[in-house]
């Protein structure tokens, strides 16, 4: 069962999209660097748990500012953006919010199997597709990586090697 109801999903998706767009396109941060901050400051976990203040209480810009403040990035932040276009970064945050909600996986777990840089690369092919197409593609990528790790683990075990 998802951490929050479907009635909050659109807001959650918009906010995560706005958060990533603001961090990259207004603040000039590298998407991967900002995403790591999102994951390590605890906000990704709170978002995934459905904490109302994080999912829909903050705007996406406010959420980005909170992440940056908690990470110790207290530089002067640009003015909030009024309008957001569907940039690659916006779409990446937007679709990851959907995928996290749908799959019920933690953002850290998603990042381990499908890094945000790979999500951005999926933009040209999937940004106009229904969300379930992204879910299928993401599940396939994550499953393939997990199978590869398990196969390597089996080969090491059969050869008598251990990984420490």
Please place each PLM-identified region on the residue numbering.
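Glycine-rich, aromatic-bearing surface loops/beta-hairpins
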Residues: 121-163
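Thiolate-centered catalytic microenvironments shared by cysteine-dependent enzyme domains
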Residues: 105-111
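Long, compositionally biased
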Residues: 52-84, 88
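A structured, charge-rich N-terminal accessory region that forms the first stable segment of a protein
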Residues: 2-3, 7-10, 86-102, 114-125
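Intrinsically disordered, low-complexity and often Lys/Arg-enriched segments
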Residues: 1-2, 72, 161
């Amino acid at each position: 069962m998802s951490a929050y109801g479907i009635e909050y999903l659109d807001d959650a998706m918009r906010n995560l999209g706005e958060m990533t767009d603001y961090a990259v396109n207004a603040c000039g941060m590298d998407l991967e660097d900002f995403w790591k901050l999102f994951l390590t400051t605890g906000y990704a976990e709170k978002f995934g748990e459905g904490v109302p203040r994080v999912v829909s209480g903050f705007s996406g810009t406010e959420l980005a500012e909170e992440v940056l403040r908690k990470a110790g990035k207290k530089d002067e932040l640009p003015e909030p953006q009024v309008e957001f276009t569907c940039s690659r970064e916006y779409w990446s945050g937007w679709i990851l919010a959907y995928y996290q909600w749908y799959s019920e996986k933690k953002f850290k777990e998603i990042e381990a199997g499908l890094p945000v840089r790979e999500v951005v690369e999926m933009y040209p092919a999937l940004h106009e597709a229904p969300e379930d197409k992204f879910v299928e593609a993401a599940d396939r990528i994550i499953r393939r990586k997990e199978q590869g790790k398990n196969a390597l683990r089996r080969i090491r075990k059969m050869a008598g090697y251990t990984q420490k």
